[in-house]
């Protein structure tokens, strides 16, 4: 719920992205998982975006937004449910290696890896399209507005 979002993060957050994180973390805990691996940083480091104009935003994502906004938010959510988050693509050795490669070498490596290991993956995974998270804007969500306007924020 939206109240869970505020309790976990102890501040107003982008409820559109936190709601699915809470649902995922809760389900993982219910299934008995104690740790999960993410692909965070892989697209940014290895040119996983299809459009060339997204390349400029990749630097900002890896060095500005991921470590200071996205990952802490996700980590707080996961740890609330006692599930450890591991991001192997953001290990210092992987980041250094990726940045040492010329961009042309990194571009498209994701598809090369998929092609190489396709025999290990189910068809529904191989053929699944990547979709951005789509949620209602906070301005349109009455529950989000109720939380945002709550008296509790005036005392912080």
Describe the residue ranges of each PLM region:
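ATP-dependent adenylate-handling ligase core
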Residues: 1-31, 51-56, 100-105
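Short beta->alpha linker loops
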Residues: 19, 40-41
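Adenosyl-5′-phosphate
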Residues: 32-38, 44, 56-156
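Short, solvent-exposed loop/turn and secondary-structure capping segments
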Residues: 47-49
